Design a protein with these regions (language model features):
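Aromatic- and acidic-residue-enriched carbohydrate-binding clefts of CAZyme catalytic domains
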Residues: 26, 69-101, 131-181
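Short, compositionally stereotyped local motifs that mark structural "simplifiers"
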Residues: 426-512
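C-terminal outer-membrane/trafficking sorting elements
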Residues: 627-673
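Substrate-binding cleft of carbohydrate-active enzyme catalytic domains
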Residues: 92-128, 132-134
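Aromatic-rich carbohydrate-binding modules that target alpha-glucans
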Residues: 466-477, 524-572, 584-594
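Short proline/glycine-enriched turn/loop motifs at strand-loop junctions of beta-rich domains
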Residues: 399-401, 449-457, 525-530, 540, ...
């Protein structure tokens, strides 16, 4: 009986843990792994290559909605059509699973963007029928809220002779899609199956629920209970009281984005609606109008300073970006309780600085439930002290951060534009101001002794061995040169003993541009013509002439088929090539759907299948034997002693390539990893 009782207690404890909505005392940091129209930077294949670099800093990555939409052009996914088809504008389901597996191998969880307030249809009322584990799921017209789309849907339903739900929308109406009736048993069954699919089959760790103002929080609690998900956060874009009410509606089974924390930061910086409206007033950060300040709700506070709905998109869609002091805003957020969510454009622009901020947060042991104390709140200077599980961290932000000086119990570890970090000396640790990562050139790193012993020195090695009293020794505040790939280990030297060792892994490697080749075969399409136009671009440049692009007349015969091809130069490590094949200008000319060729050589067969009048393509790269090379460049090692390296398309490299891939060297294929 005792054993049975213990088992029941354990099961109840486990269920309660998942019912928290967001773990208590959680020390992780989340990254929003996309921004608006970030099709280049948020491809699953691109993000997968970044997993190693995120390790130890990022614990969760919120991914863009990964389901297939009905549109053929690239879309962000906020008008979902398919649930169980996970091929999206960001990559295939296979690539998505590979990304999530790579994340997990690096201790990173993936958060799915779950858009279930509304759903797109084919016409007014037709939802797709999808089969999962032998069961076919399909929403019906009777699953659409009675007053959807300002009653326009009801008017159309009367014309078409179809029925809608008898239940009214529980919240805000989303125009342009069908608002789903979450009271419907059919809807609940489908969404629960969908969420289990995301968690169990795709591998997601948690859910970010989109537009939860549109339906009751009780449904989120129900869905999370059915799925047993560990992490859940809702987008309830409203005032603090309304957000708290929503969290309570979920029975605290979901966290929420702390929108008012974001507005505190925006107002302190003095910007609004893409305009600078005032000089900064950093004292506005001293606010009780947010989730983060409340000891009862800070566990459920997902703090952020900008996201895809606030960033500058275009002159026609300026929205509400920060515009200035992005680093100071992140420094403040990353030193405070709640679970911080870093925006991808900030991560890309200031990765080194943000990594160091995260390292300081983790070193101090700050969690989503840590307590903090205000130390200064002036117009030009604001300081908070946060008490972590391991040490205390003081963040100072403002136009004059020198206005605040902490006690002698603190050591300054970071300094940047309008921000400073001070770590309590009780941490007894060495510190380096350059975080682990990849760098394209050497740098100088500053070492700091964070110790209550004023005589503490620093000892370090760069070969990965643990430093000893006999290792290279420097005083606190000294800088050292890092000129090549190495593992830096630095520790405190006090009375002949080495403690507080920190490890930093540096890869110093300049990016070397390289060339990829994209091949197209149009044999399946009748009357395509004697040329294929390639229109290719990415977020930084257009590779070809303006639409319809550049005509590719050069061909190669591979596997008995004629392939048109074109070379493209990859100029940065995260650059990709988007491409459309077409017949040129003119009425009735054929073209394909948008394709993402990534940053490696690809082979596409243009098929006869069309999507909204555009031809689809099949990626057959994996089917091409020896990647389609019919003959390697001839190298006469005995006579010419030519030691050059060549790409698979035959381009001669100036030196041995640094970029991973397959190359031809001395007449043989060589793999650079």
């Amino acid at each position: 009986m005792k054993k049975i009782y213990s088992t029941l207690v354990a099961l109840l404890a486990t269920a309660n843990m998942f019912a928290q909505g967001w773990p208590a005392n959680y020390s992780g940091v989340m990254l929003q792994g996309f921004s608006w129209d970030s099709y280049d930077y948020s491809q699953w294949t691109v993000l997968e290559k970044q997993a190693d670099d995120m390790k130890g800093f990022i614990d969760l990555v919120w991914l863009p909605q990964s389901g297939k939409c009905i549109e053929t052009e690239k879309v962000m996914g906020y008008k979902p059509y398919y649930y169980f088809n996970q091929n999206s504008s960001f990559g295939t389901e296979v690539e998505l699973k590979s990304l999530i597996a790579k994340f997990k191998a690096n201790g990173i969880g993936a958060i799915a963007d779950v858009v279930v307030n509304h759903r797109n249809t084919d016409g007014w009322f037709t939802f797709p029928a999808e089969t999962y584990k032998g069961v076919t799921y399909q929403m019906l017209s009777t699953d659409i809220c009675k007053n959807d789309d300002g009653n326009k849907t009801a008017t159309q339903a009367t014309k078409d002779g179809v029925s809608l739900s008898q239940n009214y929308d529980e919240g805000t109406d989303f125009r342009g899609c069908r608002d789903i009736d979450h009271k419907s048993a059919n809807v609940q069954k489908i969404i629960k199956a969908y969420l289990k699919f995301l968690k169990e089959d795709i591998g997601y760790t948690g859910f970010r629920y989109d537009m939860v103002k549109g339906f009751s929080g009780t449904h989120v609690a129900d869905y999370n209970d059915a799925t047993g998900v560990k992490f859940s956060v809702g987008e309830y874009w409203d005032g603090n009281e309304s957000i708290i009410n929503w969290i309570n509606k979920t029975n605290k089974k979901s966290a929420a984005f702390d929108f008012q924390f974001r507005y505190n930061v925006r107002d302190a910086i003095g910007v609004k609606d893409n305009k600078i409206v005032s000089s900064p007033n950093w004292s506005k950060l001293k606010s009780d109008y947010n989730l983060m300040h409340d000891p009862v709700y800070r566990q459920y506070a997902i703090t952020f300073v900008e996201n895809h709905d606030m960033q500058f998109r275009s002159a026609d869609e300026p929205l509400d970006p920060l515009k200035r002091d992005t680093l100071a805003a992140n420094a403040y957020m990353l030193a405070m309780p709640g679970t911080p969510c870093v925006f991808q454009p900030h991560w890309r622009a200031y990765k080194q600085e943000i990594k160091s901020m995260i390292e300081a947060r983790k070193l101090a042991g700050i969690t989503n439930m840590s307590n903090y104390t205000n130390k200064m709140a002036q117009t030009n200077c604001f300081a908070n002290e946060t008490t972590g599980d391991k040490a205390k961290l003081i963040v100072v932000v403002g136009n004059n951060t020198k206005a605040y000086t902490p006690s002698a119990d603190y050591a300054q570890i970071l300094e940047g534009y309008h921000y400073r970090y001070y770590l309590s000396k009780s941490a007894e640790t060495a510190w380096c101001n350059i975080p682990s990562g990849e760098y394209e050139a050497g740098f100088r790193a500053k070492l700091t002794a964070v110790s209550q012993n004023s005589n503490a020195k620093l000892v370090y090695t760069t070969d990965g061995t643990a430093p000893t009293a006999k290792s290279k020794q420097v005083a606190t505040g000294s800088t050292i040169n890092i000129d090549e790939t190495c593992t830096l280990k630095v520790g405190l030297l006090i009375n002949g003993n080495v403690t507080g060792i920190r490890t930093y892994n540096y890869t110093v490697k300049a990016f070397e541009p390289y060339t990829i080749t994209v091949y197209a075969n149009a044999d399946q399409v009748t009357n395509w013509g004697s040329a294929i136009y390639f229109y290719a671009w990415n977020s930084s440049e257009t590779f070809t002439k303006a639409w319809p692009g550049t005509a590719a007349t050069a061909t190669k015969t591979l596997n008995g088929k004629k392939w048109y091809y074109m070379d493209f130069k990859i100029k940065s490590k995260d650059a990709i090539v988007n491409i459309i094949f077409n017949q040129g200008n003119g009425t009735g000319k054929k073209q394909t759907v948008d394709l993402n060729a990534g940053n490696s050589t690809k082979y596409y067969e243009i098929t006869t299948t069309q999507s909204n009048g555009k031809y689809t393509c099949k990626d057959v790269t994996a089917d091409m034997p020896t990647t389609g090379i019919t003959a390697a460049p001839t190298i006469d090692n005995t006579a010419s002693k030519d030691n050059a390296w060549y790409t698979l398309s035959g381009m001669k490299m100036m030196q041995k390539p640094n970029q991973p891939g397959i190359y031809i060297h001395q007449g043989k294929k060589q793999v650079i990893k």
